[in-house]
A protein has these predicted regions:
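Juxtacatalytic substrate-recognition/specificity segment
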Residues: 1-104, 109, 193-194
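Acidic/His/Gly-enriched intrinsically disordered linker/tail segments
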Residues: 60, 66-70, 80, 87, ...
Length: 233
């Protein structure tokens, strides 16, 4: 693979690929994402993040070594494998947020870890996490936060539902209580203990406060129609 280096990244990509064509644009985009994540989390890696930009999900599995097709994932401490082609461009905030936030801690709940990554993403399929959460509440497909904090429950549902909910919840938590308290909470390995110690509430209470907040917003009719189409494809 060819290689391109920027201030905080090493990008590996195939010759004549879409990634090679766009490598300067990709580099500038990731550097901007990196700066924002570091500013919010108040931490900066001492290493460069190394991207492997692959043409297909199958190539991701082959280069990583497990032969499992995948669009993108972070391999700690500093590697990210991602598909980048004409149809799929798995770059942006998400995997970088994992790599950088794990320098603080890796809480024992996948919901919290993915929630922080989705907080930076803001959107799922181009639609705001908050709108998706309202849509799920209105259509009785919403899953309560206290349930999602359990990995067994979290993985039993499709990420189409769980990721936007946790992204919106994380956004609400940070906006309501501030980033400093959130970072204190993120340092707890046991998230149930962290919620009680930092926020002085139980997850069920926070969930109800969050749902009440989401219900303050009306979803635009055209956006809701688009969500219906995407969700049932």
């Amino acid at each position: 693979m060819k290689q391109y280096k920027s201030s905080h990244y090493i990008f590996n990509y195939n010759q004549y690929s879409k990634a090679e064509k766009d490598i300067i644009k990709i580099s500038k985009y990731q550097e901007a994402c990196y700066e924002y994540i570091c500013n919010v989390l108040k931490i900066e890696p001492s290493f460069k993040i190394e991207y492997f930009l692959c043409d297909t999900p199958e190539e991701v599995g082959r280069i990583y070594g497990d032969d499992e097709p995948c669009n993108g994932f972070a391999d700690l401490p500093n590697k990210i494998y991602a598909v980048y082609n004409e149809e799929v461009q798995c770059v942006g905030f998400h995997e970088d947020a994992h790599v950088i936030s794990y320098l603080i801690n890796r809480p024992n709940s996948c919901a919290i870890r993915e929630g922080l990554a989705m907080y930076f993403d803001r959107k799922w399929w181009g639609i705001q996490n908050l709108d998706w959460t309202g849509y799920f509440i209105n259509n009785n497909t919403y899953i309560a936060i206290e349930e999602l904090l359990n990995d067994e429950v979290f993985f039993s549902y499709d990420c189409t539902i769980t990721y936007p909910i946790m992204g919106a919840f994380t956004d609400w938590l940070i906006a309501t209580y501030g980033i400093d308290l959130y970072l204190d909470f993120y340092k707890y390995e046991n998230v149930f203990e962290g919620i009680q110690q930092v926020y002085k509430k139980i997850p069920k209470e926070l969930n109800q406060m969050f749902v009440d907040y989401v219900n303050l917003f009306r979803i635009d009719e055209l956006v809701e129609q688009r969500m219906d189409t995407l969700f049932h494809e």
